[in-house]
Amino acid sequence: MRGRRGDRMTINIQEHMAINVCPGPIRPIRQISDYFPRRGPGPEGGGGGGGTGCGEAPAHLAPLALAPPAALLGATTPDDGAEVDSYDSDDTTALGTLEFDLLYDQASCMLHCRILRAKGLKPMDFNGLADPYVKLHLLPGACKANKLKTKTQRNTLNPVWNEELTYSGITDDDITHKVLRISVCDEDKLSHNEFIGEIRVPLRRLKPSQKKHFNICLERQVPLPSPSSMSAALRGISCYLKELEQAEQGPGLLEERGRILLSLSYSSRRHGLLVGIVRCAHLAAMDVNGYSDPYVKTYLRPDVDKKSKHKTCVKKKTLNPEFNEEFFYEIELSTLATKTLEVTVWDYDIGKSNDFIGGVSLGPGARGEAQKHWNDCLHQPDTALERWHTLTSELPPAAGAYPLA
């Protein structure tokens, strides 16, 4: 609109923006139910009450609306024949899946874990890939002594290992109470290795001599950082959580330092106890090279004269030594019932005190498998009984009072 010279020109906003402000025809808003077929109250395929059958769709629906809800969300259907423990959480599926087999061989006291492959792992490196490997721990009692590890696969989010890791000395008590922790990590040569995800499998899910297949999504359970990398406040929280975990697991929980295979037999002909030191497995590493130089000592207590000590030879640079040595204690069966056999494993060091790795006591005051092994030996003379035992970090009473050499 133009005015005369000198007059103020007025233009309304509608004319300036050329917008038609008149409302058009009001159309009904579609509801979400309009995009999906409705099941009628009648039998399937029939339309009772005018409802749309399950197999029919209204002609006005777009192709996107005809797709099933799972296709709209990008979901996939797992294979019917595979044994899959699936998770619906996006946080878990984003980490990837791990496929593996577990087999508990009760006769040989071995737990076999075959790591097959992983799929869709979370990228951890700048190139959008990862360098994944798998490590195993047995809980409770996770430590370097019972850690097993696969090889590292380079630059892949879908690694294939097909690698078998084996735990020796697994007892029925372990199967009842322990949990296998399977962690997938990314190896980084320039900094610390990064945690991707983990799976925890209670061993009680396994049946003896029956292989069980798993294909499970990784879970986001990042382990606590090391004390050196934490502030004072975080260290306090870490200590509190560890104390809480120990309280939940029960009092008197000791750190596991490996396993030892012992043979006991009372000889009625020789009137004495035969103690066989067969082998050890998954010993704790005491040297800077990641190994130990282990040997085994045995005592039959109480030992007033200190003459009951026996010692095996030293095995160099190994965490799984084989000894196959036998010691004999001349003693009557009635007296043996009041004694305690203490077996300790040590790391030999030149020029300094030897390091205690772990020990186990068998006798009337023992518990669990150690007590059962001792009682079976007393009640089954002239029979060699081999059993695996867990070595713990606590030094048996008065064991340190004897020379370590």
Curated annotation (Swiss-Prot):
Q: Give a GO molecular function annotation for the protein.
A: calcium-dependent phospholipid binding
Q: Which PROSITE patterns match?
A: C2
Cystine links in this protein are none
Q: Where is the composition biased (Gly residues)?
A: 42-54
Grouped into one coarse class, the protein's main location is membrane
Q: Where is this region: Interaction with UNC13D and DYNLT1?
A: 1-94
Q: Which Pfam families does the record cross-reference, listed alphabetically? A: C2
Q: What's the protein called, per UniProt? A: Double C2-like domain-containing protein alpha
What is the organism field in this record? Mus musculus (Mouse)
